[in-house]
Each structure stands twice: as structure tokens, then as C-alpha cells.
Amino acid sequence: MDCETFEINGIYELDRGEQDKHYDFWWNLPQDYMVSSEWGLPPQFENGVVPGDLVGGKYGHKIHFWDLRARKNIQTIDLGENYQMALEIRPAHDPTKSYGFCGAVADNTNLQGAVFTWWRDDDGKWQAKKTIAIDPRPEDPDNLPEIIKGFGAVPVLVTDIDLSLDDKYLYVACWGIGEMQQYDVSDPFNPVLTGKVQLGGIAKETKHPN
């Protein structure tokens, strides 16, 4: 897009690499990189989540690293097919830092929610590892939707994450269990849970806190 006229000049991606889905993206201008995440293809969300695709690991589970100016995908990291819907990308606000976080909505093997820390290592390669795992909440199967009755638990469903401007706290929205959790991420590789607030959740019969 032209920054003066807002006319569309064309697509950004000159070389997508492995990318075939898209969701969120953030960039770091001084370091000339961009990070993007994945959700799903239009048929996978236009009429709601497709249970078979969710169980089959067909939603997004990769994060992509780009050369910002060259508009080229330079590296892709697969978080694992079980980590479905790798959505929100949250980099450190300090532009001299080369790390950030990505939230995964659900682990389709156990209904956990997860947050990954990603970073650039000393060799210039991007890495990622799971640094937060949030357990599902046990529940009477009669109170659960059909797709998760067999688990006997409410999925966490990490639908959003946000990093405080001082890069100290990460806030994790656990939509399924109805919690907002706060983590001290002063050490981004070892987050520490410091607080949480209950706001409702599946099977709680509580109004959605919009």
C-alpha cells in the first residue's frame, strides 16, 4: 500500500516459502524482520470451526520469519500438529530485543492451552519452545459439547495474549475456562504465573465478558 495515497500496490509476499495460511503479524523495523502466524483457510472458519480438521491437526501450527525488506519467508518453525491455531504474535516492545511469544489455542491431544517463546539464537537462526502449558478444567461430560465429552474437561482455548509495554508481564486470555492469567516474563524462557481472574467459561453458565 502506498503510504501517501493508500493505493494498493500489490501483495507483500514475494516468496511465501512454506506459508499457506495466515493470521497475525508483527515486525521489527530496526532489525528488519517480521513474524507471522497461522489460523486456517476460509472453509475452516466461515461456518465455524470444522471438528474433523481440528482433531486432524489441519489448522495452523507454524510461525514464519520474514526478511522484511526483501519480502521473503526465510524460516518456518512447526510448533507441532497438535498445537492447533497458533494465533497471536507478541514481540518484545524493546526494538533491540529479538524474542517474543505466540499463543496456541488448543492442544488437540489433551485440551491444554500453550504459549511458546520464540527467539533468534547466536547463529542468527530462529528458535521456539513451549514455555507455558495451562491444564483443562475437569467437568461433568453432560455439561460439555459433544466434541469434547470424551475428555471430561473444559478446554483452555487461549484466544489472546498481550505483553505489557515494559515487557515484564504477559496476559493470557483462557476463553474456555474463563480466566485471565498474568505471567511475569522478565525471563521470557521461564514465565511465572503471578495472578489470575475468573470471568466465566464453558459450563459456568456465565454471560460472556465482552
PLM region descriptions:
Residues 37-58, 102-116:
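Short, conserved, GDST-rich strand-edge loop motifs in beta-rich repeat architectures
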Residues 7, 59-63, 98, 111-113, ...:
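Repetitive beta-architecture junctions, highlighting loop-to-beta-strand starts
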Residues 8-20, 73-84, 127-153, 194-210:
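Surface-exposed loop and turn segments in beta-propeller and other repeat-based domains
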Residues 3-6, 65-71, 116-131, 182-194:
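Short loop/turn segments immediately following beta-strands, especially the blade-tip
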